[in-house]
Amino acid sequence: LKENNFLVWKDQVEDFELRVKFRLEGGNSGIYYHAQKRRPGPTQGDPLTGTQADFDASGRWTGVIMEYLLRDVLAERGQKVVIDEQGKKQVVGSVGDPAELLKAVKAGDWNESTVIARGGHVVLKINGVIMCELEDRDPKRLVHGWLAVQVHIGPPMRVQFKDIYLRRL
């Protein structure tokens, strides 16, 4: 791949609960939400931008909420984060030890990612275990957009998705 590829759902979402089963062999993938199309021109490998519930074979990015090419990592695995009205990020607590949380993920097997987004509050779970939690009060945050699943550029990989469930809140 020359740039990241996406399968994009036809409708946009704002407040929602999304459950997706995924299986990943190698590489990096994720679920974009509140995604926006990038402007024409160099995209640095990504035709979409948006908030992402990330996962990868190495485990480095699994259970992380980020905005690729925007505000970068918003909440690492294990963190409770508040982003204030001025866009300042502060870790305010923990949902668990990052290494212990990663043990909930079944490498190379089917896992279920759950994203619950209501207003600026986002909870990311994998296999029912909370990976991180974000309270984003920044008025510039993305509040609506498309849902998309990603195939990231990089080494050979295989990612599969099934049993996609969306509930608008």
PLM feature spans:
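Carbohydrate-interacting regions of secretory-pathway proteins
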Residues: 1-169
